[in-house]
Amino acid sequence: MSLFLIYIGASNGIANYNECYTNPFNLVRAGIAMYGYCDAWHLEEVAEMKAKLISIRELPAQSTVGYSRLHTLRKKSLVGTVAAGYADGIPLAMSNRGYVLVNGVLCPIIGRISMDYTTILLDNVPEAKTGDEVILFGKQNNSELSIRQWSDAKGTHLHDILCGIGNRVKRIYKQNGAAE
């Protein structure tokens, strides 16, 4: 028995090349595949990130939102504040172009994402209330937002996004649908 662990294959390698897990190799690294991200296997994405809607306000037309007044409202609008920002791992590249889910409805991110908060437009979800769950990526009702949208917007890969999720974001690990 060898005292050494020898590997060459990560998720996509082991999905595409049998040589990655045959002699002399005795270990594989299936890291990203464990989150459901491996194009060769067409896995179900299992990572999700949630936050809470902590404030809702109606703002008049021409109000500006975010640092540097990055977004100007064209009409009177319902605007919400989400308790998550770039310190939690939301890419700044999602400012004024990304989306979240509230009650299963796609809501645009407006303005520049700040360190601790993200502002969203709630005009399509007038029933939204403070405390509602906001899906940053994952599934809600029959809707889904993929983490791939974040990596595409940032021009990077999934590993960068997953590793960039901040330390203050609580991790919950599930097995067979139940939290451990």
Where are these regions (language model features)?
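Active-site anion/phosphate-binding pocket segments in diverse small-molecule metabolic enzymes
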Residues: 1-180
